[in-house]
Structures are given as structure tokens and as C-alpha cells.
Regions:
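Positively charged, low-complexity intrinsically disordered leader regions
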Residues: 10-73
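Phosphate/diphosphate ligand-binding glycine-rich loop within oxidoreductases
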Residues: 49-157, 280
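Phosphate-coordination loops involved in phosphoryl transfer and adenosine-cofactor binding
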Residues: 55-60, 167-169, 269
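Short, structured coil segments at secondary-structure junctions
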Residues: 82, 113, 133-135, 193, ...
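Rossmann-like adenosine-cofactor binding region
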Residues: 210-287
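Adenosine-phosphate binding glycine-rich loop
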Residues: 269-270, 275-323
Length: 323
């Protein structure tokens, strides 16, 4: 590594938290520190040699109790770029299916001298429970419909690269808000940065408490698009729906699907985002997802740098790592 890179990382402050459980536990300085660190790691992963020895001899376990493609691979790649030893856990092949509790499962894994745990779980609050009950650094990779902090961090980071400082910028979140951990984490992150936030979707998919957070609500997508600088499109989370929240997918597409025809009606270019997985032809057409307005693949790329930054900063604070 170049000496300038080492000095940049070494002089950085510490996060205010010992775990990453949710954006709601972070402050504005934490966000800026994570983004600045991600800038440094983005330079690293664009070099021919993409690894740094920062987390050598640190072991990280990835515990995913829900399906994941982007997040799981992104965390694993980030950990390996930092030279950590990585364990990948699959709940479908574990003793959880034999009735073992989450705490017992994690404590057994930690007895193998694991230092950090990245967890995705269907139960809201599972990462916080672990942080209180086990002796390891915990990173929340998504807990039910509660939070998905690293997704919100990479989303804000990607927005800033496109439109600069988010203060007073108009950010729109469209779709299934009520079941989305991405939406809630994004709202917390955007509020810390002084952005104006509006959500759009059927009333049945928008939680009423958002208005108490100062979030504006719009049920007309065309009006919302005219207002926004960025539109973050969310999929319908059918796996979390026990009731009928809208008449049909066809009806949903008609009123809330993002098409090029809709974008052509407004007199400005807006940035299009999506956390994935995309249901093409439902919340967004392929033409829009693959257009010059879209930064969906940039979000995925930035996810590695953001997760490297989060992992590194927590290790720096908790294990006295500075290289």
C-alpha cells in the first residue's frame, strides 16, 4: 500500500458505535467517516492488486437466515479484500433446523474464535439481541422489515457521487414501503444528511407513522417524479404479504410502475436507483433499469467499498486495527 493511503486510514476517527445494528444508532459524523473511508477503499479495489492486509488474522462469520445474492456476495468480497478469514453459514444445512436457538448457534460458532458476525435474519431485532448476548462485533445485513443499514449507506454514497451533497435534495422512494427494511434505513440516513424525503405507493403499502417522521407522502407517481432529483424504486415484497394490499399486479404496474414514457413527460433528468432484486416489468421496466438514468450497477459496485469501510472501522475500534 502507498504511504498516503496508510496515513489517511490511520488518522481517521472511530465510529460512535461498537456494532452496526441500524442507521438509527449512527450520527452524521459516523456517516461522513464511513463515506470517507469508502472513498479510500474504492481506490484500492480499482487497482490491479485489490487486497489490503488490514484484517489479517480476523475471522468473520456470515450468517444468512434469509436468501441473499448481492448482499451476501458483497460482504464476502469486502471481507476477503480486507484479508479476513471468512466463514459462510447456511441455515438450511444447520442445526437450527433441529431446534437449536439463535444464541446457541452463534455461541457455538464464536467458540471457534470468530471475531465478527454479519447476520441477516427474518426476525426484527435479531442483530441487536446478539449484540447484547454474545461476545462479538455484530453487523446487521437485514433484519425482517426493520433495517438494512449497509444498503442505505451504499445508496446515500451512490447518490452523493451523482448529485453531490444531499442537503435539500429531493429524494423519492417508490413502492412497497411498509414491508421494506431498505426504505426505513434510507429514511434515517437521508434525514441525517438533510435531504427532503417523499414516499410514493398505494396507501395500503405506506405506514402511517412516516408522516410523524416528517416524510411526505404522494400517491400519484407522475407528480412525485416531477418533484424528485432521485427515485429509488422498491420491489413488491410478496413473501412478507399475508393480505391483499392492491387489486392486482397489473393495476400496480399501471399506477406505480416506472416506464420511459413517464420519464419522458418530465423536463429534467432524474437519477434512478433500485436495491435489487428487480422485478422487471413490475416496479420498473427493463428500458428504464438499463438506461443512462440508472445507477443500479453502480450501487452494487459501491456496496463493496461501503462494506469494506464498515467492517474496517468496526475492527479498528474493537480490535485496535489501523493498517
Amino acid at each position: 500500500m502507498e504511504i498516503t493511503y496508510i496515513l489517511k486510514i490511520w488518522w481517521m476517527e472511530n465510529l460512535s458505535v461498537d456494532h452496526l445494528l441500524g442507521i438509527k444508532f449512527l450520527n452524521q459524523n459516523d456517516l461522513e467517516l464511513i463515506f470517507e473511508t469508502a472513498d479510500n477503499f474504492k481506490q484500492v479495489i480499482n487497482r490491479p492488486i485489490k487486497k489490503v492486509p488490514s484484517l489479517r488474522d480476523i475471522t468473520i462469520a456470515n450468517l444468512f437466515f434469509e436468501n441473499s445474492t448481492r448482499t451476501k456476495l458483497s460482504f464476502e468480497l469486502a471481507e476477503k479484500r480486507l484479508s479476513a478469514d471468512v466463514l459462510n453459514f447456511s441455515s438450511s444445512q444447520s442445526s437450527v433446523n433441529k431446534g437449536e436457538s439463535l444464541i446457541d448457534t452463534v455461541n457455538n460458532i464464536l467458540s471457534m474464535k470468530v471475531d465478527m458476525v454479519v447476520i441477516r435474519h427474518s426476525n426484527p431485532g435479531a442483530p441487536q439481541l446478539l449484540s447484547e448476548k454474545v461476545n462479538a462485533t455484530i453487523i446487521n445485513a437485514g433484519d425482517g422489515a426493520h433495517e438494512h443499514p449497509t444498503q442505505a449507506l451504499l445508496d446515500s454514497y451512490s447518490m452523493r457521487q451523482e448529485i453531490g451533497d444531499l442537503r435539500n435534495k429531493n429524494i423519492l422512494i417508490v413502492g412497497d414501503i411498509i414491508h421494506s427494511r431498505v426504505a426505513l434505513s434510507n429514511i434515517f440516513a437521508l434525514q441525517l444528511q438533510g435531504a427532503n424525503i417523499k414516499v410514493c405507493g398505494p396507501n395500503t403499502l405506506i405506514p402511517k407513522y412516516l408522516r410523524d417522521f416528517g416524510v411526505k407522502v404522494e400517491t400519484n407517481l407522475d407528480k412525485a417524479l416531477e418533484w424528485c432529483d432521485v427515485a429509488n424504486m422498491l420491489r413488491l415484497q410478496n413473501e412478507r404479504m399475508s393480505d391483499s394490499f392492491f387489486p392486482s399486479v397489473r393495476e400496480y404496474k399501471k399506477h406505480f410502475g416506472l416506464t420511459m414514457e413517464r420519464l419522458d413527460k418530465i423536463n429534467k433528468k432524474i437519477v434512478i436507483m433500485h436495491p435489487g432484486p428487480i422485478n422487471r416489468g413490475v416496479e420498473i421496466t427493463s428500458e428504464v433499469a438499463d438506461s443512462n438514468n440508472s445507477i443500479i450497477l453502480e450501487q452494487v459496485e459501491n456496496g463493496v467499498a461501503i462494506r469494506m469501510a464498515v467492517i474496517y472501522l468496526l475492527a479498528k475500534k474493537n480490535f485496535d486495527r489501523w493498517i
